[in-house]
Amino acid sequence: MLMRTCDIRFYKKLQQPQFSENGEVYSHKCQAFAHDGSGGEFVLLEDGSIGLISSEGSVGRVADRLDDLLTFLVNGANIFDFSYTNLYKNKEVLRTFCMAYLKKMRNEYAENRSDWDEIHGALAKKLSVPFTPENLPELAETFYQAATRIPTFICSYKDGEKDYTCDSVLSDIFPRWIGTLLQMTKEDFETLSHK
């Protein structure tokens, strides 16, 4: 149920990240404790915070504590749906996005004759984390603060003679689906988010 609802499945024990066999160097010591549906891994960092090494090559801290991550996921968030940095430049824009996002999720569940609140609420109870979807904007802000906290969690690697750094879990590329959800163009969104 956790994988289907929150896109996370725990390993039986801590292990080396699967993305450590090609000379990847992580800025923090880490051990994988879970994976997502696409093969990315959640890792416990040496300072106790939580990182994500995605299967698409992005890397970053996503929570300061495991409870923060689980609360964020249970209350409706997919990490990558909340990775657009301009969402966080204006609190009203973030709130508007979060409420539209929750409405979309509830509607998708209803189309499948399921109750989003009932399913996620039961899971929150089972995990002993708060179920407060109305606080999703604050939970998203907590995610953003963890992702941008210095020192950030990054990965570098060599390809031949060149050094590379993996992309961050945060992105400044405007996801088209956000514009569709909020019924605005990229330009409209950016104008609003910078007010």
What are these regions (language model features)?
Residues 1-57, 84-89, 101-195:
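A surface-exposed partner-binding patch
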Residues 54-93:
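Compact, glycine/acidic-enriched structural inserts
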